[in-house]
Amino acid sequence: MTDEIDQLLIGALMEDSRKSLKALAALSGLSSPSVAERIRKLEEREVIKGYTVEVDPKAFGYQLQAIIRIRPLPGQLQEVERQIQNIPQFTECDKVTGEDCFIARLSVRSIEQLDTLLDNLNAYAETNTAIIKKSPVKRRLPPMA
């Protein structure tokens, strides 16, 4: 479990993962060494799993993002999972309950590239595609408290 100070530190790092120990110390009322120790323990317990850079896919020519619902053909579940893992344009994928087995997000440079990727996948699964127009809520954590 985490306490209120841990949650405060995590929240601050979620807003800006480059925030200095000095700034985190001022925010929390702890010393910099105490903050460093708390963060080390949170990392050790894998509460904090990493630090990342948010990049705009369009900067690399990926003009379209899509959500793909994927339903493997009979006997193809493992192959479909392997295919998704090996196609680098898939940026996220969740195995889910319900009619579909996977819901995935992918970034492509064009509709033609999307068609090619889906044509290859359709040998193993049925797919349903929705082009993302806007993301009003970016990936985030639920409230910690």
Residue ranges of predicted features:
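A compositional/biophysical signature of low hydrophobicity enriched in polar/charged and small residues
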Residues: 1-145
